UniProtKB/Swiss-Prot annotation:
Record-given protein name: Profilin-5
Subunit structure: Multimer. Occurs in many kinds of cells as a complex with monomeric actin in a 1:1 ratio.
Organismal lineage: Eukaryota, Viridiplantae, Streptophyta, Embryophyta, Tracheophyta
Disulfide-linked positions: C13-C115
Predominant place of localization: cytoplasm
Organism from which the protein derives: Zea mays (Maize)
GO cellular component terms, semicolon-separated: cell cortex; cytoskeleton
UniProt keyword Repressor, yes or no: no
PTM note: Phosphorylated by MAP kinases.
Family (UniProt): Belongs to the profilin family.
Length: 131
């Protein structure tokens, strides 16, 4: 299965009539493996900030999480495993695997829990597969 198929079929899947606004799979080096058409362009320093927060949980909390220039307030995630952010009525979930970051962005009416489930389920699967 191609990386794009993971984005299209697993991250952008229909959950109770809702789906993510945008999604991507990105390497730890910032290279985009696959993304939805409307996923914002990541800046190298944004990916570096995510990786640093996974290595040193809490580093993004004071400044916020930036994705494509959009700032998200960091909310409780799982230190070293999942970063969660909130912006207005939407938000973001980022799951770290051994080689990649699984990123899902949502807006209402999708809920944070639905976003978390979609992103973390694929992340857990990729970890099991050695990615």
């Amino acid at each position: 299965m191609s990386w794009q198929a993971y984005v299209d079929d697993h991250l952008l899947c229909d959950i109770e009539g809702q789906h993510l606004s945008a999604a991507a799979i990105v390497g730890h080096d910032g290279s985009v493996w696959a993304q939805s058409e409307n996923f914002p362009e990541l800046k190298p320093e944004e990916v570096a900030g995510m990786i640093k927060d996974f290595d040193e949980p809490g580093t993004l909390a004071p400044t916020g999480l930036f994705v494509g220039g959009t700032k998200y307030m960091v909310i409780q995630g799982e230190p070293g495993v999942v970063i969660r952010g909130k912006k207005g009525t939407g938000g973001i979930t980022i799951k770290k695997t051994g080689m990649s970051l699984i990123i899902g962005i949502y807006d209402e009416p999708m809920t944070p829990g639905q976003c978390n489930m979609v992103v973390e389920r694929l992340g857990d699967y990729l970890i099991e597969q050695g990615f």
